[in-house]
Amino acid sequence: MTPRTRYLVVCLLTALAACGTPPRPAGGPTPAAAPSPAAAPSATTTQGSAVPPITPPAAASPTPAPTAAQLAGRRIVYSYPGPVPPQDLLDAVREGRAGGVIFFSDNTIDPAAFAAAVRQLRQAQQQSPVRWPLLLMTDQEGGRVRRLSGAPELSARQVSEAADPVRAAAEAGAGAGRNLAAAGLNVNLAPVLDVYAAPGNFIDAKQRSFGKDPGDVGMLTAAFTAAQHREGVAGTVKHFPGLGTAPAGANTDEGPVTLADPLTELREVGEAPYPAAIAAGAGLVMLSWAVYPALDAERPAGLSPTVVQQELRGRIGFTGVTVSDALEAGSLAAFGGTGQRAVAAAAAGVDLLLCSGRDTAQGLRAAEALADALADGTLARDGFTAAVDRIDALRAGLR
């Protein structure tokens, strides 16, 4: 442990003590069985008091078992263009065929219209047979990567360069949580855990990395995650097993990226920050679309059972929700269309599929492919329902 890391450990412990008891880990290993949705950990208010999970009204008769289409839809995060949610998205939500919605700048640019859109989506969910709130999410990393105006205004690099970086990270996480919660959102696709290897490389170019030392990155992202979690917003740590060595311009959104990191480097650097951030309350882990030959030379991480099941679930011990990066990414061009990509990711062990092409039809195609794969046995029912159960447990603890 470097002197700087020892210093950050002390700062982190001090910050957590000042904020009260840290939240129960949302995705870390536990000796007990995974909780049912009704028993999932609750979110917290800004004061740290428990927020009870949303529960359904008493029903006169048992709720019918979900259809294959509903189970499949609950694994999809939809997106849409512009300020107004389209009718087909509202219908999917109302019929229990949606897991969540991701928002981009074209959705949020008009605050009044965005507030109306969130109300519409929440009202549609209240009419749904699914008892839990939608996962309403965006990328609010800080600095140059923000979909909502306001906090956190500091980038990850600026946080790491602060006089008290752990305190700055906690303030950034709290600011992100309050900002999203005020807008009616309950999931942040942040913080970034990538440990950058060279100044100006892909992840450092927009100041998205908290540092070059994995111990520092683990401490700072843990502080960010814990503070955000206390505001009632679930954190997503990304991009497993790490994009820190990607050179400038190596963007998986645009095309294939292969990172030839040795296995020891992947584990001692790229994956090293994850246990601390998961223990601090991260409810989701996003998989990278890069290829890592040390783990799987044939498939991007998010399509690789080796990466998802053996590294993340097995070695790291993560039991929460796994989420894909953008399903429309250029790095997946060789892996078929939307439906084929969705089934391949689900087969690898990814729970939640991010259909972020600003087109509801993309999510509907992915859901249809999942439902067909469930019906014909391509995807095993036990694994499929386990993924839905993890998503429902996450939703049950949010507002």
List where the protein language model places each region.
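Sec-dependent bacterial lipoprotein signal peptides
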Residues: M1-A17
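N-terminal low-complexity, Pro/Thr-rich disordered segments
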Residues: C19-A69, Y78
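DNA-contacting surface of Y-family translesion DNA polymerases
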Residues: A59-A116, P129, G143-R146
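Second-shell residues forming the walls of enzyme active-site clefts
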Residues: A68, I109-V130, D216-L379
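Hydrophobic faces of well-ordered beta-strands that scaffold small-molecule active sites
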Residues: G73-Y80, G99-F103, L134-Q140, V187-P191, ...
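Short, acidic/polar
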Residues: G82-R94, A169-N179, R267-Y274, G336-A344
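Glycine-rich, aromatic-flanked loop segments that form ligand/cofactor-binding clefts
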Residues: R122-P152, A172-Y196, V217-G242
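Mid-to-C-terminal alpha-helical segments outside catalytic/metal-binding sites
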Residues: D372, D376-R399
